[in-house]
């Protein structure tokens, strides 16, 4: 059985890890980095770039470079947070036929799980390159405060990427696993403060020793799925754009290219101000008007940045208060505070968290890697490689159904340990009612309409009876991924109806299947592209070596040989321009055949010379042969370079 890898699918960056022995190892990608930007770009020649290569070309291709797509996953186009994002990103966010928020690239609508799947494919390939074997199973992390549709959409992304998602695990819980596995025995309560690129989570977790087993029990969780480093960047972008408008009268929001440059500069300045007190944002030729080019130069202090984002940091403390209250603890009962997510490197965040908890947060957890490492540990627990760990997670939001008067009646309260199952009996609202609609909602509001609608289904053929008489038993069953199954049963007839909640919209099985096929087709195109590059490199190396041999052979080559070789080289150069793999391979054969007799002649001559000087110092290797050797090495080097 292959390894189950752990993937932290982040808003800004992603990370992949695997358990080696009893330690989780973060795997470096092809570029040598331990994290990969969660950025996907579509180029003019229909190539899909993922990670650093996509990030590098974002400034010149802003409309087709997609970042922070995790913020859209499992969301409706009409959601306020989505509408706010539309104004802030250079790419196009559109409404899908089912009402979900999708993105549009080159006139083609794509679902967020499709884009996330490209990042997951890169993570899968990174793990496969390292392990030297196929990887088909993964544990993928999500923000603890993700609702059911967002979890389902993340599973869909895994499926599109060719992965069987063995478990969806909450990010703070994963970080606690990574932290708690190598700590001394004994019971303690920790708070995981997870401020990532796009989401914020807080979980209160009790780590206990139960009969030699590490037990991780989540006591409570809370958060905000639209608060993260991207929002800190946006505050800074707004400030820089406003300063530029004041001095130049030009609004940079209308220029996607300028907006993309601003985003990069804001992110860089924010990171620099974590270690220095002042920095300068300098963007020459940011735009132009009738009077000529305009440059943006703004001095920025740490104090200014902190004043711009202090409200965001304070906003994160509200869910923290709720989580501690829900865990039925006081702040002083928290033994350790763990910081996770790149945004927690900001001194202001560390200061506010330390002030709130009355203790310094731990510094021995890598905020970018802990989540992926925890996912890898959970993968090893599921595969049986790790046996002394028990993980008890919770559902983050209350689940219930809509009852008479539009009230949300809870069946499973938030922070209930999962997996769990709960049943409740309801009845009809009118006389002789023969069908009931079960409307499933998720959230903390008393009014059903103000909560997230997860889906609805009908239980029909109820025998007519006075209102309040029929007994309809509704059962909620949450699995270990936090994904819900709902069934309704008429107790009189035994008739039952059930659904797996896939959100009130989401992707259908057919859509997912088509996206899987599409992803496989892309993989085939990638393979063909690699074969073409390999063939091209081989021919280029051969042409170079043959030219060199011909030049150094001088008058040892007959006019006929020279003419045949030059004709083959001309044809080869044309084939290289064409980009046709078959033509390139045919040209490679022609060059090899045309230069074969000359190569044999030179080799025979060299052998004769070596025999003539036998017993001497061995003589110098003839130049022509040396050149031919050089050529072979050149060609091999090119191929290796391509396969890197």
Swiss-Prot record:
Instruction: Show the SUPFAM superfamilies listed in the entry.
Output: Actin-like ATPase domain, Heat shock protein 70kD (HSP70), C-terminal subdomain, Heat shock protein 70kD (HSP70), peptide-binding domain
Residue spans with biased composition (Acidic residues)? Answer: 631-644
Low complexity bias: where? 604-614
Q: Which UniProt keywords apply?
A: ATP-binding, Chaperone, Nucleotide-binding, Phosphoprotein, Stress response
Q: What induces it?
A: By stress conditions e.g. heat shock.
Entry-linked Pfam families: HSP70
Q: Which domain of life is it from?
A: Bacteria
Q: Which residues carry this modification: Phosphothreonine?
A: 199
Its biological purpose is as follows: Acts as a chaperone.
Give the record's family classification. Belongs to the heat shock protein 70 family.
NCBIfam families from the entry?
PRK00290.1, PRK05183.1, prok_dnaK
Q: What is this protein called?
A: Chaperone protein DnaK
Organism of this sequence: Teredinibacter turnerae (strain ATCC 39867 / T7901)
Lineage, top ranks: Bacteria, Pseudomonadati, Pseudomonadota, Gammaproteobacteria, Cellvibrionales
């Amino acid at each position: 059985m292959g390894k189950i890898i752990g993937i932290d699918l982040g808003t800004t960056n992603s990370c992949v890890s695997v358990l080696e022995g009893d330690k989780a190892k973060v795997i470096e990608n092809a570029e040598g980095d331990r994290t990969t930007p969660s950025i996907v770009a579509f180029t003019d020649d229909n190539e899909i770039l993922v990670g650093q290569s996509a990030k590098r070309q974002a400034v010149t291709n802003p409309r087709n470079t997609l970042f922070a797509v995790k913020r859209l996953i499992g969301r409706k186009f009409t959601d306020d947070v989505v509408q706010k994002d539309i104004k802030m990103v250079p790419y196009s966010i559109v409404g899908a036929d089912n009402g979900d928020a999708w993105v549009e690239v080159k006139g083609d609508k794509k679902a967020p799980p499709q884009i996330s799947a490209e990042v997951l494919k890169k993570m899968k390939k990174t793990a496969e390159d390292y392990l030297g074997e196929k990887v088909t199973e993964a544990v993928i992390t999500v923000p603890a405060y993700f609702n059911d549709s967002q979890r389902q959409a993340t599973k869909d992304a895994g499926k599109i990427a060719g992965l069987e998602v063995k478990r969806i695990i909450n990010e703070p819980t994963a970080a606690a696993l990574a932290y708690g596995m190598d700590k001394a025995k004994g019971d303690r309560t920790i708070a995981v403060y997870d401020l990532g690129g796009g989401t914020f989570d807080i979980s209160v977790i009790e780590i206990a020793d139960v009969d030699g087993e590490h037990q991780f029990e989540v006591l409570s969780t809370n958060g905000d799925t639209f608060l993260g480093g991207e929002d800190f960047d946006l505050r800074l972008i707004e400030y820089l754009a406003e300063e530029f408008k004041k001095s130049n009268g030009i609004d940079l929001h209308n220029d996607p290219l300028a907006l993309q440059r601003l985003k990069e500069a804001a992110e860089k300045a924010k990171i620099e101000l974590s270690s220095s007190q002042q920095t300068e944002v300098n963007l020459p030729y940011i735009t132009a008007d009738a009077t000529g080019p305009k440059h943006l130069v703004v001095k920025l202090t740490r104090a200014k940045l902190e004043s711009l984002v202090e409200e965001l940091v304070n906003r994160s403390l509200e869910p923290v208060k709720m989580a501690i209250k829900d865990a039925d603890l006081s702040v002083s009962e928290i033994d350790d505070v763990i910081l996770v997510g790149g945004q927690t490197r900001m001194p202001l965040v560390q200061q506010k968290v330390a002030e709130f908890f009355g203790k310094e947060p731990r510094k021995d957890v890598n905020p970018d890697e802990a989540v992926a490492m925890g996912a890898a540990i959970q993968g090893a627990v599921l595969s049986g490689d790790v046996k002394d760990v028990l993980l008890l997670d919770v559902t983050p939001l209350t689940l219930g159904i809509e009852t008479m008067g539009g009230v949300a009646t809870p069946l499973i309260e938030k922070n209930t340990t999962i997996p769990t199952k709960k049943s409740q009996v309801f009845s009809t609202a009118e006389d002789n009612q023969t069908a009931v609609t079960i409307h499933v909602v998720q959230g903390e509001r008393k009014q059903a309409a103000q909560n997230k609608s997860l889906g609805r289904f009908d239980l029909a053929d109820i025998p007519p009876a006075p209102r309040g008489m029929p007994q309809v038993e509704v059962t909620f069953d949450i699995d270990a991924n936090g994904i819900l199954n709902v069934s309704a049963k008429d107790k009189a007839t035994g008739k039952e109806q059930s659904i797996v909640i896939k959100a009130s919209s989401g992707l259908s099985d057919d859509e997912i299947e088509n996206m899987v096929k599409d992803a496989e087709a892309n993989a085939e195109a990638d393979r063909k592209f690699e074969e073409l590059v390999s063939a091209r490199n081989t021919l280029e190396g051969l042409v170079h070596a043959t030219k060199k041999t011909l030049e150094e052979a001088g008058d040892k080559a007959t006019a006929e040989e020279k003419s045949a070789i030059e004709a083959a080289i001309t044809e080869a150069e044309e084939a290289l321009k064409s980009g046709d793999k078959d033509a390139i391979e045919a040209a490679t054969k022609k060059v090899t055949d045309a230069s074969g007799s000359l190569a044999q002649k030179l080799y025979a001559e060299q052998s004769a010379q070596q025999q003539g000087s036998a017993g001497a110092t061995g003589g110098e290797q003839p130049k022509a042969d040396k050149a031919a050797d050089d050529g072979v090495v050149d060609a091999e080097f090119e191929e290796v370079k391509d396969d890197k």
